[in-house]
Amino acid sequence: MKGHEPVVYDRASELGGKIRSAIPSSRLPKEVFDHELRRIMGKVTRVKLGEDGITEELFMDIRDRYEYTVIAVGAQNPRELKIKGHEKAVAALGFLRRAKVNDIAVGEKVVVIGAGNVGCDAATEAYRLGAGEVTLIDIQEPASFGKEREAAEASGAKFLWPVAAEAITRKGVVLSSGEVLGADTVIISIGDKPDLGFLPDTIDTADGYIKVDSRYRTADMKVYAIGDSVRPGLITDAIGAGRSVALSIDASFRGVDESYDRLPAIDTARIRLEYYDPGVREFQDIQVCSVACASCGGCRDCGMCETLCPQQAISRRPLQGEGYEYVVNDERCIGCGFCSGACPCGIWELKENDPIG
């Protein structure tokens, strides 16, 4: 959208990462994800899929070929729980991937070691696949929260803490107390870590993650890193980091230095509040609240600018997929400002032309 041409490399046959392959559809409906991906791909036309087995040589080739490189490889390697019989268990990430395509049987009883949000997703999916009893255990108070925790509890999952797993046998999970939790399937959900074996020595790491500054730049000024390759976090964290990096790269191309973390998303003076019903509303369900979002700074495709333009200088142009853009015919535009004055979200901005002569 800033006028640059990004190129995306991905080892999978389809874009989407864990959102497509592992996160349950109950968390993010497939139709919503597909719609958002089509919208994004309306802007990104250069995609190279099936780039499996990235090596340092390939990475350096990419790094040298383009002005900037953004590492967003996520965390795909499950952390190991080094207890006796751990090979009898399945990692949560692998379980969720197979569960999403209904390619795994769970049996009657399931024990999940690790009661974070991913563990809750695994528990909920286990119930969907036919489990009758699911128990999540943790050595400390579970870190799970929000919809994931609520969904697991609503499905019937039990939480036990603080308890520690000593071994995994054919009968189930042996606790440090000697108690055995019977299980047909044991799922280990203690986190994932990124595979950074392709990084050159010029990019610093710490504790298995890429070291970055406040703008997500690595020790190599041409390379940025975001998401779980930097630190464990939420999808929204990765999306926000991606936006910050995009703005930072654009600023570099323009030869300016801007601190986006301290700038508002849009000047509130540009928002036409007369279009909205004012009032303080109590917090409700997140989906209810999201419907009321005015999308300040983002086009809602209302078409008011195109309708009101007295010179018919504005037109809507479809892009690839479900994308679109509104364009101005410079030969028709008279600078009346109707578009800027009518836009509910503050998209249009009038700028003076350079003096002639």
Where are these regions (language model features)?
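Beta1-alpha1 glycine-rich phosphate/pyrophosphate-binding loop at the start
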Residues: 1-53, 79, 84, 115-158, ...
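Conserved beta-strand-loop-beta-strand element in the redox core of flavoprotein oxidoreductases
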Residues: 49-69, 168-180
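A conserved FAD-binding loop/helix module that cradles the flavin
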Residues: 122, 226-259
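Flanking helices and flexible, charged tails adjoining ferredoxin-like Fe-S electron-transfer domains
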Residues: 5, 20-42, 46, 59, ...
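Iron-sulfur cluster-binding cysteine motifs and their immediate structural context
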Residues: 7, 11-14, 81-82, 198, ...
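FAD-site-proximal beta/loop scaffold in flavoenzymes
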Residues: 87-108, 181, 185-240
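Mid-to-C-terminal Rossmann-like scaffold of FAD/NAD(P)H-dependent oxidoreductases
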Residues: 150, 154-155, 164-167, 244, ...
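Short hydrophobic core segments
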Residues: 9, 66-74, 112-113, 183-191
